[in-house]
């Protein structure tokens, strides 16, 4: 080997050796591609949840139904702490797992201003984890609190039936929806009583082990559904947290404001938006939904039901302003 080649080989060997020393002393994590969760949530210390369910529970808070339980049975925590904890675990699980799947169904990017669970963990893992957690909570309830198990399974069936009705309407548009306005409102209220009302009724049944609060909690559930529907199209704060305005319209959801807008003289814009999904038709439809007539009718409906369940509404603590109207 010539002197020149020997010198070149020596230089290359020295460079590779130096690089090896550097790599050995670098943290192994620095050599790995970044976890996609880290890009969204920040440093590794902030990446506490490795599970979609725990992630969404951190957003809402553990046992976030506790104020409702305290109102229904002020002494339950002291008199039967095991059942108290189990009720809260059941409510967390059913509510949050429904949210996880609902965000996938709606193709939502955000939940309460944070990335939706499926954006971080993927649709498959998020959906499967929701099914797993619900299965686990049903099994645990059956084994440890068998008297509560029928309430859980019956209410869950009602919730999913309501969700199924809503999804069929979304799939078929107006073809499977009643034609007359009054019938449409009735259909919406029935769907809401299943989809959301059953969740609130479940709480009362678990705490009291009877149906004595069904009527009241059904009204609380309807108010909650109605409030969410209205925030979706009338609240700038809610739109910011969700990352979009009128997500329900874009998903062809038949919500209360949209049903009212269909009955307006320019309601054909809603139908066009459902059919085409084009930005122009969506914008025209939003104009109809945010019209004074629809806005006032929604406020009247909210006030009517709030007057019956004001104490419960205060516990729910939803305060976004309905500030978007034409």
Curated annotation (Swiss-Prot):
- Which terms under GO biological process does the entry name? alcohol biosynthetic process; isoprenoid biosynthetic process; mycotoxin biosynthetic process
MF terms from GO for this chain are:
metal ion binding; prenyltransferase activity
Q: Could you say which residues bind Mg(2+) 1 here?
A: 102, 106
Superkingdom per UniProt: Eukaryota
Question: A Pfam family matched by this chain, by name?
Answer: polyprenyl_synt
Query: Might you give the EC number(s) for this enzyme?
Result: 2.5.1.-
* PANTHER family (alphabetical): GERANYLGERANYL PYROPHOSPHATE SYNTHASE (PTHR12001:SF44)
Q: What is this protein called?
A: Prenyl transferase nodC
Q: Which gene encodes it?
A: nodC
């Amino acid at each position: 080997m010539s002197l020149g080649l020997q010198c070149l080989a020596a230089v290359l060997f020295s460079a590779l050796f130096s690089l090896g020393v550097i790599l050995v002393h670098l943290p192994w994590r620095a050599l790995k591609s970044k976890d996609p969760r880290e890009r969204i949530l920040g440093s590794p210390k902030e990446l506490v949840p490795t599970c979609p369910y725990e992630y969404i529970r951190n957003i809402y808070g553990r046992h976030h139904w506790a104020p409702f339980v305290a109102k229904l049975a002020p002494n339950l925590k002291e008199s039967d702490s095991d059942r108290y904890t189990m009720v809260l675990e059941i409510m967390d699980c059913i509510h949050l797992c429904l949210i996880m799947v609902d965000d996938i169904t709606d193709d939502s990017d955000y939940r309460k201003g944070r990335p939706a669970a499926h954006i971080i963990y993927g649709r498959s893992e998020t959906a499967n984890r929701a099914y797993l957690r619900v299965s686990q909570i049903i099994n645990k309830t059956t084994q440890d609190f068998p008297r509560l198990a029928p309430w859980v399974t019956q209410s869950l069936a009602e919730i999913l039936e309501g969700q199924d009705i809503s999804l069929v309407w979304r799939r078929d548009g107006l073809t499977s929806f009643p034609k007359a306005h009054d019938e449409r409102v009735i259909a919406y209220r029935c769907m809401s009583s299943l989809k959301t009302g059953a969740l609130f009724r479940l709480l009362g049944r678990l705490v009291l082990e009877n149906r004595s609060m069904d009527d009241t909690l059904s009204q609380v559930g309807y108010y909650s559904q109605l409030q969410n529907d209205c925030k979706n199209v009338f609240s700038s704060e809610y739109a910011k947290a969700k990352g979009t305005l009128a997500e329900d319209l874009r998903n062809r959801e038949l919500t209360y404001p949209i049903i009212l807008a269909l009955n307006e003289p320019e309601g054909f814009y809603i139908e066009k938006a459902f059919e085409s999904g084009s930005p122009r038709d969506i914008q025209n439809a939003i104009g109809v939904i945010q019209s004074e007539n629809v806005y006032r009718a929604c406020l009247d409906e909210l006030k009517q039901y709030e007057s019956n369940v004001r104490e419960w509404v205060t516990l729910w603590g939803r305060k976004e302003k309905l500030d978007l109207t034409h």
